[in-house]
Amino acid sequence: MKFIIKLFPEITIKSQSVRLRFIKILTTNIRNVLKHLEDDTLAIVRHWDHIELRTKDDNLGPEICDALTRIPGIHHILEVEDRSYSDMHNIFEQTLEAYRETLVGKTFCVRVKRRGKHEFSSGDVERYVGGGLNQHIESAKVNLTRPQVTVNLEVDQDKLILVKARHEGLGGFPIGTQEDVLSLISGGFDSGVSSYMLMRRGCRVHYCFFNLGGSAHEIGVKQVAHYLWNRFGSSHRVRFIAIDFEPVVGEILEKVEDGQMGVVLKRMMVRAASQVAERYGVQALVTGEALGQVSSQTLTNLRLIDNASDTLILRPLISHDKEHIINLARQIGTEDFAKTMPEYCGVISKSPTVKAVKAKIEEEESHFDFSILDRVVSEAKNVDIREIAQQSREQVVEVETVAELADTDVLLDIRAPDEQEEKPLKLDQVEVRSLPFYKLSSQFADLDQSKTYLLYCDRGVMSRLQALYLREQGYTNVKVYRP
């Protein structure tokens, strides 16, 4: 099986040295993402205008293709088949054999790309093959403007490349071509989308989480960060830094005037994140702030928040409205996480200012004990995001993991609804119930607690984290199902 990986167009307009560097980084990223397949026949070769991937194991094709569509820097992926040919008529015969069933009752056009010296042009092949297909498939009709099927062919020297399928890529720049950033992640719609946008633009995104809601909140945000990394950024190692911000919030509640609390809290977060960024050599912070969305996100307040630190703050969503942000979250798969993620920042100020005055803010901050901020930063927990899955195993070691089910057990499929539809879970003589992970906290108590519930997800990370959460809530009738 062979894939031709086409580069994001902005890469192709770079200078020769930059373009070669980007292609080299993208090739390395692809290798890193696919190394878990342990396929000895996998070969990846970079060229000037594309990257070629081959494997002898056809069963891995769908998994490889799915992974490639989630790697930044790729415009599209062509699933192709190499063949030899003798002349233009032979090209037509092979194309007819490959596309006859596909074109029945459809409109079509033929598009050809050619490399090398030949006695014919690309247009010659398009007309000859297209005319032949039109004659030999009676129900097929040519439509050059809006065809239902596009027959893509490539003639490379003495090889005919039949394009069996085209898959759209993520676009953007390969991760690692730009410098590292630190995302202030809360688990909501905005921070998840802003993190994704910087990954897509070529940045390795580390995560900084300010914990205001205890272990349950931290577990939820870890799920979001791990999901984003695993889905779009697993080519690189990244950090997840958790800072216990409850002492800072307590000091603000005690020392700062009500109306100024929101801006002061954001300034404290920026100060703390800047210290973390400096410690690890990160160049910029990323937030999910959008202009005018909440009281602290007016231009006046954002300017005051920026002034708390010299570190560059990037706000990729600054001009986006909430509906658009939610749509983006739905596209990348973080919507379900964000729907049930509690928002703690908004509860600390009853009448927040929308136009803070610098002198007033500084006066309020003069009452603040900054040793508390320094202490929570020094005590921050820093983990490799790849260890989150391992940590979840260690944290729920008291939660039994089983591979077989008893007749009286109830299997809870906690995957998102779209995942359940794509890969339905059916087991003989076992009751299977659907309860997505984001509804567990609110609906698990409604279940019959005399039964034992086995939580299932594809990779086992989400089920372990949710099992830990339920155990913390006092439920002992929970296990993890790993077939």
Swiss-Prot record:
Residue positions of the active site: 457
Domain Rhodanese: 405-483
Coiled coil: none
Domain THUMP, first and last residues per copy: 62-166
MF-aspect GO terms: ATP binding; CCA tRNA nucleotidyltransferase activity; tRNA binding; tRNA-uracil-4 sulfurtransferase activity
Entries under InterPro entries matching the protein: Rhodanese-like_dom (IPR001763), Rhodanese-like_dom_sf (IPR036873), Rossmann-like_a/b/a_fold (IPR014729), ThiI_AANH (IPR020536), ThiI_fer (IPR054173), ThiI_N (IPR049961), THII_Thiazole_biosynth_dom (IPR026340), THUMP_dom (IPR004114)
List of residues binding ATP: 184-185, 266, 288, 297
GO term, biological process aspect, one: thiamine biosynthetic process
Keyword Ubl conjugation: no
GO cellular component, one term: cytosol
EC assignment: 2.8.1.4
Pathway(s) this gene product operates in, as recorded in its UniProt entry: Cofactor biosynthesis; thiamine diphosphate biosynthesis
Disulfide bond residue pairs: 345-457
Pfam families, sorted: Rhodanese (PF00581), ThiI (PF02568), ThiI_fer (PF22025), THUMP (PF02926)
Keywords tagged on the record: ATP-binding, Cytoplasm, Disulfide bond, Nucleotide-binding, Redox-active center, RNA-binding, Thiamine biosynthesis, Transferase, tRNA-binding
Compartments where found: Cytoplasm
Reactions it catalyzes: [ThiI sulfur-carrier protein]-S-sulfanyl-L-cysteine + a uridine in tRNA + 2 reduced [2Fe-2S]-[ferredoxin] + ATP + H(+) = [ThiI sulfur-carrier protein]-L-cysteine + a 4-thiouridine in tRNA + 2 oxidized [2Fe-2S]-[ferredoxin] + AMP + diphosphate; [ThiS sulfur-carrier protein]-C-terminal Gly-Gly-AMP + S-sulfanyl-L-cysteinyl-[cysteine desulfurase] + AH2 = [ThiS sulfur-carrier protein]-C-terminal-Gly-aminoethanethioate + L-cysteinyl-[cysteine desulfurase] + A + AMP + 2 H(+)
Protein family (similarity comment): Belongs to the ThiI family.
Its job: Catalyzes the ATP-dependent transfer of a sulfur to tRNA to produce 4-thiouridine in position 8 of tRNAs, which functions as a near-UV photosensor. Also catalyzes the transfer of sulfur to the sulfur carrier protein ThiS, forming ThiS-thiocarboxylate. This is a step in the synthesis of thiazole, in the thiamine biosynthesis pathway. The sulfur is donated as persulfide by IscS.
Entry protein name: tRNA sulfurtransferase
Name of the gene encoding the protein in the UniProt record: thiI
